[in-house]
Structure formats: structure tokens, C-alpha cells
Regions:
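Conserved nucleotide-cofactor-binding alpha/beta core module
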Residues: 1-62, 70-78, 149-225
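A generic secondary-structure signal marking the coil-to-beta-strand transition
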Residues: 47, 64, 84, 116-119
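Conserved catalytic-core segment of nucleotide-activated headgroup transferases in glycan assembly
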Residues: 90-183, 190
């Protein structure tokens, strides 16, 4: 049974869930933009679970479980979760193993990279990037030649802030490239030009990381907290 409730008032959604006698309700967004976590406070189902979209604890009494793995929540960090933890083996994250990669092949030069350049990419949203990562990336660029940093062009202010940071570090701005929004299949195809994907630390990559791994790009990360 599928019900489209995207335009239904919140309390009507709660009422409908109770009428349908849903056994388990899963919050796939958590504390993220345009989420509906507040509906779970009304108890839409006897069992309510936090999963996938927000891997941190929701810190509430109305979410009973979180689905995770040992990388996402090591035993040492479980004390920080209000939810009981359901551990899946290996990875908690389901991925589409049939993601389409565009058959229209591109070259590095199509994205303004020299043919023999080394491309370090971080295509996470800019809000995830902190001064810690920027300092590390700056040192890499200072100590290497023909290395380029590929970032996501998410908004004008974020882009300008990043450019100004590297200018203040005396980094040649021509070595900082910004990836525009493309269709997912075209994005996957261009991502293959990256040599290494550099993750952010406080908020790690999610879909962007699985995309990189899907097209064979190694990921360098650090477990966040």
C-alpha cells in the first residue's frame, strides 16, 4: 500500500498512520532540512526508527531504535545515543548497484584540468567543510605540483568564501575548480576523473562517498564524532 502524503497536513498524516495501524514507522530524514521528525512525537506507530538520512542520535524519547553498523556507531560511542541500536553486518547503507553512468565520455580537459594533473576532489556540500580540512588541503597544494582541488559549487557565498580562503593562503586559484550540478549519471561519469576523494571530518560523506566508490575513486576519510 502506497500513500502520497506530501501535501497532507501533519496531523492528518498522523491520523492516517493510526487508521492504517502501521506497525513500524521509520524516519529517513531526522534533523535535516524539510524533515517530518515532529510527526513521530505523536507516535504514528508502536515502534519508531531513525535510519539513513541522519546517522546521529535524534535525542528523543519517541524514537526507539536507530539502524547502524560498527563503523557508523562503534561500541565506544553507543552511550551517546538515546535510541537502542540495531546493528547491521558490514554496512548499514543500502546502495543501488545499478546506478547508471553516462555513456558520453568526457576528458579532464572538459572540466578545465590539465591532462596529466592529479585531481583531489571533495564534492560534499560546502557546509560540511571546516577550517581543519581547508588547512590540510592547503598544505597538500603547497607541497605538490600539478595537483588540483575539485569542490562542489553549491552556492555563491560558499564558493566565494572558499576562494578567499585559498587566496589568503597564496594558493593559485586556478588550481581550485568547482563542479557544477549535473544529472546523476553525468556526475558519476565526470567523477571518474578524480584521483582521490577527500572526505570531511565533522560531517562525513554519505551518498557522495558511495558515488565515488561506485566509480572506482578511493576515499580518504576520518571518523567523525
Amino acid at each position: 500500500l502506497y500513500k502520497d502524503v506530501s501535501n497532507v497536513p501533519d496531523l492528518e498524516i498522523v491520523k492516517l498512520s493510526r487508521e492504517l495501524k502501521i506497525d513500524i514507522a521509520i524516519d529517513l530524514k531526522g534533523h535535516t532540512l524539510n524533515s517530518k521528525t515532529k510527526l513521530f512525537a505523536y507516535r504514528m506507530a508502536p515502534i519508531q526508527i531513525n535510519y539513513l538520512g541522519y546517522p546521529g542520535s535524534l535525542g528523543t524519547s519517541f524514537i526507539d531504535y536507530i539502524i547502524a553498523d560498527k563503523i557508523l556507531i562503534p561500541d565506544s560511542e553507543s552511550k551517546h545515543y538515546s535510541e537502542k541500536i540495531i546493528y547491521l553486518p558490514n554496512s548499514y547503507q543500502p546502495n543501488d548497484n545499478q546506478r547508471e553512468i553516462s555513456k558520453i565520455e568526457t576528458k579532464k580537459e572538459d572540466f578545465d584540468f590539465p591532462e596529466n594533473s592529479l585531481i583531489l576532489s571533495c564534492l560534499n556540500s560546502t557546509y560540511k567543510i571546516t577550517p581543519d580540512e581547508l588547512e590540510i588541503w592547503s598544505r597538500i597544494l603547497e607541497k605538490t605540483n600539478n595537483t588540483y582541488l575539485w569542490l562542489l559549487d553549491t552556492n555563491k557565498q560558499g564558493k566565494n568564501n572558499l576562494i578567499n580562503f585559498f587566496k589568503n593562503k597564496n594558493i593559485d586559484i586556478k588550481r581550485i575548480k568547482f563542479a557544477e550540478n549535473l544529472s546523476h549519471s553525468c556526475h558519476l561519469e565526470r567523477l571518474r576523473h578524480s584521483d582521490v576523494f577527500l572526505d570531511t571530518f565533522n560531517v562525513n560523506a554519505h551518498t557522495t562517498c558511495s558515488d565515488a566508490l561506485w566509480v572506482g575513486v578511493p576515499v580518504v576519510t576520518k571518523q567523525g564524532k
